[in-house]
Amino acid sequence: MPSYSVRPAAPRDAKAIADIHVATWQAAYQGLIPDDVLKAMTVEKRLAYWKEAIEYSDPQILVALDNDKVIGFAGFDRSRDPGTKSSVGEIWALYVTPAHWRKGAGLALWDGARDGLKEEGCTQVTLWVLLANASALAFFEHAAGFKRDMPSLKTTAFGSVRLEELRLKRPVD
């Protein structure tokens, strides 16, 4: 299995992050989210978002590198869920290029995000995942040790389709 390095994202990484965000959504959510929604997701739109996120550290962003090439990213910070304690963090995003799926890059990003959440004083961490995304559920539950936070389903609209998301949680340590 390859070894990946992880570091905080820099402004120069915004384009690579936007490329990865679009490519992974189009690969992972094909058949789950309508094609017109996936096709409307452009690198240009994502680039503006990620430039601002990196500039303001909202959320905090890490990138995974294979040699010197950005091949994945994670965004994390305090939980955005209403009514949660300040000691609860959230993985806002964790995406790796399809060519690097199941090779350890996601775990390297999770480990880096977990360290960042610990530094922020978080003791618990949550994330939301599409209930129909079996691959993501398998990664977070089996590889990263998350458990389903029942009952925590919410419905999110993706174009004309409404999909259920499930919150997962675990201790930071």
Q: For each of these PLM feature ranges, what is it?
A:
Residues 4, 8-11, 22-32, 36-99, ...:
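Acetyl-CoA-dependent GNAT
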Residues 17:
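Hydrophobic pocket/interface hotspot
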Residues 20, 120, 143-144:
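Structural motif
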Residues 84, 126-129, 141-164:
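Conserved catalytic-core motifs of GNAT/GCN5-like acyltransferases
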Residues 97-99, 103, 131-132:
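Active-site acidic-Proline motif in GNAT/NAT acetyltransferases
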Residues 117-128:
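Conserved GNAT acetyl-CoA-binding A-motif
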Residues 136:
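Helix-turn-helix
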